[in-house]
């Protein structure tokens, strides 16, 4: 059988092949948004078998197994690692046309040298044995070095002491590992008990009693300063929508007091006004320090109550939300811009219908401060597939500047997911190569190739100042 993952995988023209092999393939990776555990990097985690590195914590794979009718004990339960791997392998043939099929075979090829068999129930034993042999010498740091990673930005709560980032920074590990300030829990006022528990952690980290809304802002500012001192230059906010709810300071204070001292339910409009206020305050902090601010907009989380109670969050029970936030986004950006507090911003939407809306909106707020200052982020989560990436690239190309795009990221908890950069680069080169062949772009490989190199490496390196 011809190798599925070959040198020209996804590259359907000679121009695509030239672009990829000459301008993209060997570029270092700037993975500016991921969910890797910095402790696992610092401690150079090793794995006993492929199930641990491949299936542990990967809710993408878990969802596919559930869709294939696999019992939960083989997914997150007490089945053996070998049994779990077998069940995932049996699911693989059902995944044709799902990006997981491509991702998995790219990972098998790049990290384990397995490119001569396709994973299935029948080949599971062979792949298990071959992969586990390689894992004897493969570690977290080795995965990063082998993938030519230059820098990563993890995702960290403001209460983190950043111990492991400090350890990595003081070591001889050549990959930059920077924290990202992600204060989502400071917004989550609807759940009184959880919010109060979180504020207790924030109080301890910031060394302040939080008894008012102003105290909350002081605490966040102290942690923001601490993160900056430890190399952080990026923030991230996971929000269900963008809010624009005008409220007086005393109303925000009343809502905060209700959150920390009352069992009275907070009304949706009160929560929206509070979240809008905190988001704007944090945006101002980001701008003052010259950080890049990221907004991830739109997921509908924890849909399955039974499974949420059994497994908690981030277990594969989130989906695409839907809201109309064009006007709110306009007002949000305009208010920050008018106050001189709109810094570099990347907006990721989970619903593909919002691609053009956001891309067009961002053109209203560009600046000579930095070319491509405000960006539509790469296709995210459920859109992280060939079709979703293509649609996102079309929106950027048609309504913004493709040549200023900062490119791809993994958004992953897995040390094997760096092949997603390769996947994106191959698609980008295939799109541009196809248009060169059809005469829609100049047949000038150097011209188009420079755009490819910029998106793959130069643009994110400059944008994030890494």
At which residue positions do the language-model features occur?
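Divalent-cation-assisted or electrostatically stabilized phosphate/pyrophosphate-binding catalytic cores
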Residues: 325-329
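Hard-cation-handling environments
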Residues: 299, 304
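Short glycine/proline- and charge-enriched loop/turn segments
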Residues: 308-316
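Short, basic/hydrophobic alpha-helical segments
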Residues: 332-338
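A short acidic, glycine-rich active-site loop
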Residues: 268, 317-323
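C-terminal amphipathic alpha-helical interaction region
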Residues: 293-295
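Metal-cofactor-binding active-site regions of metalloenzymes
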Residues: 2-289, 341-343, 347-359, 363-466
């Amino acid at each position: 059988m011809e190798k599925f993952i070959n040198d020209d995988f996804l590259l359907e023209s000679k121009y695509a092949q030239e672009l990829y092999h000459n301008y993209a393939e060997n570029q270092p990776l700037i993975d500016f948004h991921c969910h890797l555990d910095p402790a696992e990097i610092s401690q150079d985690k090793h794995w006993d078998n492929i199930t641990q590195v491949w299936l542990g914590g990967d809710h993408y794979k878990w969802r596919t197994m559930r869709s294939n009718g696999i019992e939960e004990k083989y997914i997150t339960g007490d089945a053996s690692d070998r049994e779990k791997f077998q069940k995932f392998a049996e699911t693989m043939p059902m995944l044709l046309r799902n990006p997981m099929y491509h991702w998995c075979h790219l990972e098998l090829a790049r990290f384990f040298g397995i490119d001569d068999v396709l994973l299935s129930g029948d080949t599971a034993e062979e792949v298990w044995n071959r992969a586990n042999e390689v894992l004897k010498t493969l570690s977290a740091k080795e995965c990063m070095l082998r993938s030519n990673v230059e820098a990563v930005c993890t995702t960290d709560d403001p209460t983190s002491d950043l111990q492991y980032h400090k350890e990595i920074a003081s070591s001889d590990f050549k990959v930059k590992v920077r924290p990202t300030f992600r204060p989502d829990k400071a917004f989550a006022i609807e759940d009184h008990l959880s919010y109060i528990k979180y504020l207790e952690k924030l109080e301890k980290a910031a060394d302040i009693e939080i008894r008012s809304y102003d105290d909350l802002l002081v605490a966040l500012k102290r942690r923001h300063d601490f993160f900056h001192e430890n190399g952080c230059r990026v923030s991230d906010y996971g929000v269900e929508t963008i809010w624009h709810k005008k409220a007086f300071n005393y109303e925000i204070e009343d809502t905060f007091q209700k959150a920390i001292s009352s069992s009275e339910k907070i009304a949706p409009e009160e929560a929206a006004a509070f979240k809008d206020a905190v988001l704007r305050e944090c945006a101002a902090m980001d701008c003052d320090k010259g950080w890049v601010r990221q907004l991830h907009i739109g997921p509908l989380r924890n849909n399955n109550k039974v499974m949420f109670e059994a497994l908690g969050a981030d277990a594969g029970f989130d989906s695409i939300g839907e809201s109309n936030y064009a006007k709110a986004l306009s007002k949000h950006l305009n208010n920050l811009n008018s106050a001189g507090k709109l810094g570099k911003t990347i907006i990721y939407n989970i619903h593909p219908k919002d691609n053009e809306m956001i891309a067009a909106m961002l053109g209203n707020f560009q600046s000579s401060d930095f070319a491509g200052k405000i960006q539509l982020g790469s296709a995210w989560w459920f859109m992280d597939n060939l079709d979703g990436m293509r649609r996102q690239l079309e929106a950027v190309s048609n309504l913004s500047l493709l040549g200023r795009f900062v490119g791809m990221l993994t958004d992953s908890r897995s040390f094997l997911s760096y092949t997603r950069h390769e996947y994106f680069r191959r698609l980008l080169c295939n799109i541009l190569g196809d248009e060169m062949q059809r005469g829609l772009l100049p047949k000038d490989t150097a011209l188009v190739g420079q755009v490819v190199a910029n998106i793959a490496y130069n643009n994110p390196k400059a944008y994030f100042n890494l």
